[in-house]
Amino acid sequence: MKFTYEEMAKASISHNEVNDCIVKAVSIAFGMTYEEAHHECKIRGRKRGSGLSWEGIKDLLEHMTSEYGFDVRLVLNEAIEEKFMTGRVKYSIKAASLPVTETDKPIHWVHNRYIGNSKTIRTFARNNPKGTYIVFTHAHATAIVDGVVQDWARPGRGDLKRIFGVVEIK
């Protein structure tokens, strides 16, 4: 089932929640209800009004792969990519098509072009009009579905830290 940010925002209010961007992003990317995503985050250590640790996020993504039939691939990892960025080279982010079978090789990076010195949610969404992604900035998570940023924040705020592509295996 597909959900939008607006639907998740209403669910968040009805649960009297704040700082639940990871819950909303997971719900939208994996087609889960807010309640299901909230539960999955809670059992991995998320406390009411707080985010989720990277360990919890990794565990959640692995769980979605093994238990729910999704293929989750790392598309961008800033820690890996920083060593390849020198000077004021112009780049742009465009994700390659995500492999959807076990025999396909995982994606660790995409094209070698970003725009300016910062990689933004807006740029990534514009360059990736198809597919589902969970995007992490410094202290925020959001979902992008078919080029549409599902978030309250103005798209483009914050440098990208990690991006995971999500494909449902049928």
What residues fall within each predicted segment?
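Active-site nucleophile-adjacent alpha helix/oxyanion-hole segment immediately C-terminal to the catalytic cysteine
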Residues: 1-74
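Conserved active-site-adjacent core of cysteine acyl-enzyme catalytic domains
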Residues: 47-139, 145-154
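Noncatalytic regulatory segments and standalone regulatory/sensor domains
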Residues: 148-170
